[in-house]
Amino acid sequence: MKTKLIVLNYAVHALCTVFALLQFSVAADISAAAFILCAAFIAFLTIISSAVFTLKKVKNYPIVYKLYQYVPFVLLAGFIMRRAGGTALPYVQDVISVLLWLAASIVSVTMLYHLNPKRVFVQNPDFARAAAEAGLISAKNELLPKKRRGGAKFIFEALDWIDAIVQAVCTVVLINIFIFQLYVIPSESMVSEFLIGDRVIGFKTASGPKFPVSDVGLPVLRSYKRGDIVIFRNPRYPQDNKSEVKTFISQMVLMFTFTKVNLNVDESGEIKADPLVKRVAGIPGEQLVMQDGV
């Protein structure tokens, strides 16, 4: 194997290990599971990838390739689980964890680029020879499909579908957090600009989106003036860690069920009007006067 792949592999393991250590907790709640999840994933990735890159078990290459696809998602799950408990973490620890997540995600994506079946066997002849001897690839360096029958075929096809859905949902969640998100107008407050049920897209990147369940985020790159349409969290509802985790989970469930199940409800069981889509009426430094409720 080329040195580049070996270095990238070690880099991912090192970044993930430090990240996992920062999620360690002795509290008797869900936060304790964060370290266990990250550590178990890293240990499994290390064992499988070491066997593949030393050419001892080349047949496990598809597993390694799949595991690297899940690095950002597993670490994100660990980050959220650690903050779902009752113990608050220092802001500095959140910053370091986010930076480690970002670095591990970038390196893992780079690793996936080099591990792509269209490149890895062409760029690594020794790996290609070992894969051919193991019956993993053809003479044209193309992966050979495994022949499965009966129940095994059904199970693996079902797992492929589940894998595709999970990765799609996790990718959409990341896009919704940092780039843009689709919202539905719940009330008449924006008539005649928007009607009830209208869908609007809110672009987040320039507005300083926050990492889930933390105050760490991108810098705010834009300012707002009177008349701008803005999207913001409803201050009526609590925004502590427990509530933020519930909101995040409800978004995941909403996507996995194709918008059929919405768990984002208040104490009375009503769906939350959160976030809100409003028009800016006043800017910092101005005074507003209410007359006859207007």
Describe each model-derived feature in a short phrase.
Residues 1-275:
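Protein maturation boundaries and topogenic segments
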Residues 273-294:
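Mid-length scaffold segments of soluble, non-membrane domains
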